Amino acid sequence: MSGARLHTLLPELTTRQSVMVVGAAVIDVIADAYALPWRGCDIELKQQSVNVGGCALNIAVALKRLGIEAGNALPLGQGVWAEMIRNRMAKEGLISLIDNAEGDNGWCLALVEPDGERTFMSFSGVENQWNRQWLARLTVAPGSLLYFSGYQLASPCGELLVEWLEELQDVTPFIDFGPRIGDIPDALLARIMACRPLVSLNRQEAEIAAERFALSAEITTLGKQWQEKFAAPLIVRLDKEGAWYFSNDASGCIPAFPTQVVDTIGAGDSHAGGVLAGLASGLPLADAVLLGNAVASWVVGHRGGDCAPTREELLLAHKNV
């Protein structure tokens, strides 16, 4: 049933609502680890690859490959990492609205365990050095979808980004807090939620959010209480169990697409990219989440986080589903 619906939706993808992606482009050094290192140990890793990544770049690539045009505010610096990112973006037909900043882009080491779970160690660069001059370059049309990552919101520039968001008129923020949901100060988090964003959380992040907001950790009750407290949409991703969505209009669980998990790097980003592509095309939230599930299932079945599918690849992958 989901596959049939996906085949109906994919040809309809086109940019009907403007999208602005605000966030980071960084380098991911990905390595296999037989176990996570413990204090004082010395373990040998097997390098998989050195990829251009970052939450916002993963989403920009996913949108582009699905045929959605977006404005990409991904700060690029002047160092070796920045040049690698710039070249990678050019190959995807992408440019950044914030380019040639002083300093280099950041990078992270991703350790992938035998079961596919990943652990990140990150080093910040220009992507977390936002200032008012950069923000002044961005033109956000009324009615736009506006993506933010928790990595930037939890960084020292987070308050500046929220101030800018509060000044914008008639926009829909899409926020993927990621693992930084526990690091954002209470006062700033309250201001973010006052903007009534569409929030996407994975299972662990939903538990943290429930605790921070004094809500139930049971998913359906959490969704109901979230609507009562914030009057804003919520997505909770449950891996192979699918994804729940909650809004003032409807709620439900969209099943996951079957796949063989290779690694989970980029799973949340790709899901967000699929959802944004659906929303930008004017699809209802349920269909946008279905598209997010399809994109995420493709990504976790391939190594690395920069492997978002095209529409044609999704059609082929799910032709018999």
Curated annotation (Swiss-Prot):
GO terms for biological process: phosphate-containing compound metabolic process. It comes from the Bacteria. Keywords: Kinase, Transferase. Its EC number is 2.7.1.-. InterPro entries: Carboh/pur_kinase_PfkB_CS, PfkB_dom, Ribo/fructo_kinase, Ribokinase-like. One of its GO terms (molecular function) is kinase activity. Gene3D superfamilies: 3.40.1190.20. Belongs to the carbohydrate kinase PfkB family. PANTHER family: RIBOKINASE, SUGAR KINASE. This is Uncharacterized sugar kinase YegV. It comes from Escherichia coli (strain K12). The gene is yegV.
